[in-house]
Structures are given as C-alpha cells and as structure tokens.
Amino acid sequence: MINYLFTITTWLIIISYWFIIIIVTCRILSKRRAISSSAAWLLVIYIIPFIGICTWFLLEEPYLGTRKLKLIKSVWSKKNKHFNNLKSHNYIFENNNSEVARSLFKLCKYRQGISGIKFNKLKLLKNTKDVIKNLVRDIYLAKNTIEIVFYIWKPGGLADNVAIALIQSAKRGIKCRLMLDSAGSLEFFRSKWVDMMQQSGIQIVEALKINLLHFFFRRMDLRQHRKFILIDNYITYIGSMNLVDPYLFKKSLGIGQWIDLMTRIEGPISTTMGAIYSCDWEVETGQQISPKRVKNNLIIPTYPIKECTSIVQVIASGPGFTEDMIHQALLTAIYSAQQKLTMTTPYLVPSDDLLRAICTAAQRGVEVILIIPKSHDSLLVKWASRVFFSELLESGVKIYQFKKGLLHSKSVLVDKQLSLIGTVNLDMRSLWLNFEITLVIDDKNFGKSLAIIHNEYISHSSLLDPKLWKIRSYWKKIIEKLFYFLSPLL
C-alpha cells in the first residue's frame, strides 16, 4: 500500500512538474519578446527549473497589474485635451526640422500626436554643484508650483540644500509636490525629512510602493526612473542626475564620484512635462492635477527670440505610455546618422536591434563612439556589457572607458545636430520596463555644447584596443559567454 501511494505521488509530482514547464514554455513563446530574451528564459528554466520558474513568475509574469496598466492608459489618453489646447498656439510648433532630425520628429509627431516645440531656451549643466546651485535659486524664485520626481533622493550633503529650499518655499505658499520611487529613495522615506517636509505643506508620494502583497502581483524591479523638476510649469530640469551628493553617493564602492548631465529649460515644452507629471501623480494618488489651460503669457518667451534655436520633443516611456516609443526613437536616430554618432551610457546591455543598428552605422562609414564607465556599481552589468564589445569593435565602433568616476550621463548626439538626453540607459530595463523620460533636441548650437562635453569625457577615458581585447584571458571569455545568455534578462 505504501509503495503504491509512493508511486502515485511520484508520478503526480513528475506530471505536475512537466505540466508547469510546458505552461511556462508556452507562455514565454506566446509573448512578443526578442528571440534572445525568450531563449535566455527557456535556458534558465530547463537548466535550473525550480529557480528558473520562480524567477520567471517574479520578474516577468507579474508586470504592473492589469488594473493599474488600464488606469495609466486612461489617464494618459485624457492628457490629449491638454495637447489639443496647446495646439491652439500654433506659432510655437515647428515642422521644418533639420535633415538628420526629420525622421525622428515625424515619428514623435505621428505616434505622440504633437509636433516639435520651439521658443525654448536650453542650457547644459555638467556639474552637480552647478545643477544644485541653479535649482535652489529657481526654487526660491518660484511663484506658483514646484513639482519634482526622482528615482533616488539620498539625504546628506548637497541634497539637503534642495530640501531646505523646498521647505522654505512651501512655507511661503508655493504648492510643492514631491514624487520619489519607493525602492530607489528608501533611505529618504526613513529619514527626518519626510515629517519636516509634510509639516511645511509639501505633498509627498511614494511611487510604486513596495510591500509584501505587491511582491506576488507586480515586478519589484519595475521602477519610477524619471528625473525632472518642473517650476511654475515653465522651467524644467531634466537628465540623468538623482538628487544625491555625488561625492557621498555609494562612496564605499570606491569607484569615485558620479558624473551626470542635466538640461535646464525655459519655455513652452515645460507644459508637456507638466502633462507627464500630472499623469504620474494621478496614477499614484487618484488626485487630478492637470496643467491649467495654457495662456499666451505662459507661451511667449521672456528672453530674446534669437536665443531660442532649439526644437524640442519629449518622449515619456513605460507601461501604459506609447508602446515601444523610446526603442523606436533610438533606432531612428542611429539610422539617421551620416557622419558621427556619439553615445554615453552607464549600462550597456542593448537589444539585438539596437546592437545591429550601432554596428551597421559603423560599417557604413559613420564614426561611432561609445563612452561607458570603466568602473561599475553592478558586477552583473559589468560582465554583461563586455559580451557586446567584440561585435562592436569588429564593426569599427570606438569604445572609450571613462576612468574619472562613474559616468552616469545618458546621451546621444547625431551629426552634431540631433541630441537625445534623459534617463534612458542602453539596457533592457530602461527600454522595456521602467518609467523613463527623454528630451529630443534639434539644434546645432546645443549639439556643439554636447559635443564639447563628450570630448571632455573622452579626455578622461581610455580607448579600448581591439587587438588587446582579442587576447584577453580565457577565463574572462568564459565568464562573458555565461553572461551572454543572461544579458536579455538584465
């Protein structure tokens, strides 16, 4: 009898095991994902079934939640009213783009429903101290609203200057809203600043809040990765910088300070940023804070028109927003390059399509430069990035490894004319998962400024020698091959 029960139990376990394997396999194959990503998941599931299946359900199957995804789509679609209102001020729109930017701006127009916007004054800020100094000044000068979203806010050092300025502005009647990612800003939410800010009247939202219940129903690595500040619906700061002191942040890793890049904008493009912020805020709180109807005095610039040479688009990406938009934008920008393409990213784990586009650009005579950090804060990303070096080098891509800290800026410059700056890394997480934001800028003067910064990065970098790369140690090649299978999962 015991043997019979044992046999039945064994067969039930075996049948259940293969049933689950088959179900998960069918689910993986039914999703519209890159072949490399599907193959990587299947490999993990068949080699280490229990761990592989559990990891799949935790990282892939629970996405954002059907209910919340529908909410985002619904709220974002309502913002079309704001864009329609903006269209009544037709003199701020510009459809006559430069040749290299034309395809990308057409893509943005037809997929997002709005043309490029002119009359914007842009300034690149490459030093965190300068960013904080300018930001604190603008916060003190705010007249109506201050709206902030960051992935990481780490108290201490320069970050506290912003906190103090916010509190003082709130006390004088400025409406202040602060939205921070729950995981990235965990230290902030455990600090004294939360109570101090709330007591002064600042509204604080913990975005994509982490708790035990969500662990089973939503991806924990899906994060609010946007980083921008909107003041009076007219001034915007946007870029790669988290609200941290670069001299203190992750100091124990011994990789030096973080090097970021931000853009300060004055002009009507900020009204688009306001629509994006109000969407994120409403999704998290249920509170509608849609930007007020745009008036002429908010559109007409207060600075000389001759300074407004930039045509700007904004791409908001993430679950519920325009599907695959940032991936398509990057591909379009790369394929538009005719002379020179420079890209900076801290994390290089591109999709197959992006890798092919970058290599093809180099093979058709475009000078392609990739600037990445030599030291990483993530061992996984470090090895995963190296997987792609051989193919890039063989195609003629120049890879520079930045040595003076962790280069965290995310930028693309095409033919010194078309620029992309924002929060998107060249990795799967930024391209397909996180909530991100990117500026698209058609402006030769801005391109020149960005090129100068890129050259400064290069001056503090070492050029990877293709010959030396080929003769690297055998054990390194083995580790890289192992990470090749895991790279689509990162």
UniProtKB/Swiss-Prot annotation:
InterPro entries on file:
Cardiolipin_synthase, CL_synthase_A, CLS_N, PLD-like_dom, PLipase_D/transphosphatidylase
Which compartments does it reside in? Cell membrane
What does the record list as coiled-coil region(s)?
none
For membrane topology, the record states: Multi-pass membrane protein
Sorted UniProt keywords:
Cell membrane, Lipid biosynthesis, Lipid metabolism, Membrane, Phospholipid biosynthesis, Phospholipid metabolism, Repeat, Transferase, Transmembrane, Transmembrane helix
Q: Which SMART domains match?
A: PLDc (SM00155)
Recorded GO terms, molecular function?
A: cardiolipin synthase activity
Note the Gene3D superfamilies from the entry: Endonuclease Chain A (3.30.870.10)
* Primary location: membrane
Pfam (any one)? PLDc_N
Q: What are the EC numbers?
A: 2.7.8.-
Q: Name one GO biological process term.
A: cardiolipin biosynthetic process
* Cellular-component GO terms for this entry: plasma membrane
Provide the reaction this enzyme catalyses: 2 a 1,2-diacyl-sn-glycero-3-phospho-(1'-sn-glycerol) = a cardiolipin + glycerol
Active site per UniProt: 225, 227, 232, 408, 410, 415
Using the UniProt record, name the top-level EC class of this enzyme in a single word. Answer: transferase
Q: Which residues cross the membrane?
A: 4-24, 39-59
Using the record's annotation, list all stretches that form the PLD phosphodiesterase domain. Answer: 220-247, 403-430
Which NCBIfam families does UniProt cross-reference here?
A: bac_cardiolipin
PANTHER family, alphabetically?
Answer: CARDIOLIPIN SYNTHASE, PHOSPHOLIPASE D
User: What family does the entry list?
Assistant: Belongs to the phospholipase D family. Cardiolipin synthase subfamily. ClsA sub-subfamily.
Query: In UniProt terms, what function does this protein have?
Result: Catalyzes the reversible phosphatidyl group transfer from one phosphatidylglycerol molecule to another to form cardiolipin (CL) (diphosphatidylglycerol) and glycerol.
**Which HAMAP family does UniProt cross-reference here?**
Cardiolipin_synth_ClsA
User: What is the recorded name of this protein?
Assistant: Cardiolipin synthase A
Q: What is the taxonomic lineage of the source species? A: Bacteria, Pseudomonadati, Pseudomonadota, Gammaproteobacteria, Enterobacterales
What's the encoding gene here?
A: clsA
